[in-house]
Amino acid sequence: MATKGIYYTLVTQLDKLARHNRQGSFRTKDRYYEAVKRFCAYLAAHYHLQKLENVSGKHLVSYVLYLQEQGKSASTVKTDLSAIRFFHDKMSHPRYTLPGNEELGVALERRRFGQQDRTWTNSEFGKLIGRAMAEEREEYILALYLARYAGLRIHECFRMDTAAAERALRENALTVKGKGGKVRIVPIEDDRITMMLERLLDKTERGHKLLVPDGVPTDRAINGMQQFIIRHRDTICDPTAPDRRITFHGLRHTYAAEKYTSLVSGGMTPLDAHFTVSRLLGHERPDVTDIYLASVKGGSVRGE
């Protein structure tokens, strides 16, 4: 069944649940319905899931990461999760019990659009690399390098297979298929990426994913990376900033800020630098890129 057909099938199931719902105000009902309708579109496009009763924790984790990539606030993400659980509770025979927010293993941190500095310090990054080395997690080391020095999203890192890695080494550039199937080219500008690509290629069977062990679902491998950061976060973050909560996605912010600063320092105009960073990140909307450049004064396309 085509994605569009699957989507309509899921919405039909949602409509049946909604018709029998007598709880909540009209506003809440509408808000929850629209939230789960968007979730249906995601399930159809990314999982080809045909029954809402088969929704599980892995779908929630994946969807949360997707919403965060879209720049959605923590309150919006939490409301959407509440909506999904609300309708899940209305199902007669759900296959799985959905985990709570604390059990997802994904940080639902507070975000203030275009204001919050989410970049990592060199010390924080170096310490986490050290932890990954100590635990011999070479796949985590490569993922961290790809995010920090090439701006890749976490799912873009874990999607990489041997063919993509070989092409990157040949061309000295990463060909990245991002959200919506949009392809972008990101030059490899740090030798450590090349080094780790070569090391993992030597250990990975041809045709397999570089950062995902055989037999392990990709979403579980991604969750493992998230948990690794959460586990070590308190020991690597600045102790004078107890509320600081670094995330993998913050490395993308670090890449954007450092790239923008480097381009402007090299003589490029702020406007041109902004659009260059936007293209490298795989974004088209200036306001979204502004979020990534929150730590850089003048990083806005408007020159604010």
For each feature predicted by the language model, list its residue ranges.
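Basic, Lys/Arg- and aromatic-enriched nucleic-acid-binding interface segment
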Residues: 124-154
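N-terminal core-binding DNA-recognition domain of tyrosine recombinases/integrases
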Residues: 15-30, 34-115
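N-terminal DNA-binding module of tyrosine recombinases/phage integrases
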Residues: 1-23
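DNA breakage-rejoining catalytic core of tyrosine-based enzymes
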Residues: 110-127, 181-191, 205-208
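Active-site/catalytic core of tyrosine-dependent DNA strand-transfer enzymes
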Residues: 189-245, 249-255, 261-262
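Conserved tyrosine-mediated DNA breakage-rejoining catalytic core shared by Y-recombinases
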Residues: 159-196
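C-terminal catalytic core of tyrosine-transesterase DNA break-rejoin enzymes
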Residues: 145, 250-287
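Catalytic-site neighborhood detector that most strongly recognizes the C-terminal catalytic loop/helix
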Residues: 180, 279-304
